[in-house]
A protein has these predicted regions:
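Conserved nucleotide-ligand handling architecture
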Residues: 1-221
């Protein structure tokens, strides 16, 4: 029995981080040995423009299943909701995000969404991005950190993944955008700022009462 199987009470969310530059080869080895890399993942990896990108994708998939195994979840093909959110028909929530050489896996007692992005110059001109940024400043999130549109974008991504919605609906439907703003202002959802390095920003969206824990993927390798 793994340690995480003992967490049966209360609302919680754990975030696991992996450095694909230093751990990617080992993750691929584990993924192949434990048969974590199914036909659908391998097929998707073939669509990437370079071998490096394909290997990072497969390594992040191996990381997902390695983490889920810590919670007693065995490998199986993922099901996908109408807007692309993966599910396994289990009570726990989980989510994966990858940018550059970094991957994070969020596991929670209920729904969870996570997004990380490499800091870079981006042209995010959609009105909802500015509106979310203004809302974040108003509620004082994240504390002690600067606000920018890329950070607001990670919140938008995490929120839509939390709810199993497509980002296009948030961008195109005012009703969905208003719902997000209302949930941020009322603290119906909990936002966790992910400052993994000076070059990466991110956000995790969980239930409002979830106790958040942080884990290094290195201890699973």
């Amino acid at each position: 029995m793994t340690l995480h199987l003992l967490r049966s009470e209360g609302s919680w969310a754990d975030l696991w981080s992996f450095d694909l530059a230093s751990q990617g080869v080992r993750l691929l080895e584990i993924g192949q040995h434990r048969q974590f890399l199914g036909a659908s993942a391998i097929e998707r990896s073939s669509r990437f423009a370079s071998t490096t990108q394909a290997q990072r994708f497969l390594a992040s998939r191996a990381a997902l299943w390695l983490v889920l195994a810590e919670y007693g979840v065995g490998y199986q093909e993922l099901d996908y909701g109408p807007h692309g959110k993966p599910s396994l028909g289990i009570s726990m929530g989980f989510n994966l995000s990858r940018t550059g050489d970094v991957a994070v896996v969020a596991v929670a007692s209920a729904d969870v969404g996570v997004d990380i992005e490499q800091r870079r110059s981006v042209d995010l001109t959609e009105p909802i991005v500015a509106e979310v940024g203004s809302t974040l400043r108003r509620i004082g999130w994240p504390p002690r950190l600067g606000h920018d549109r890329l950070q607001a974008w990670t919140v938008m991504e995490a929120w839509t993944k939390y709810h199993g919605l497509s980002l296009h609906r948030l961008l195109d439907e005012r009703e969905v955008a208003s719902r997000m703003i209302d949930e941020l202002e009322s603290r119906t959802v909990q936002l966790v700022s992910l400052a993994l390095s000076a070059y990466i920003c991110g956000a995790m969206c969980t239930g409002s009462e979830a106790a958040v824990g942080y884990e290094s993927g290195s201890r699973l390798l």
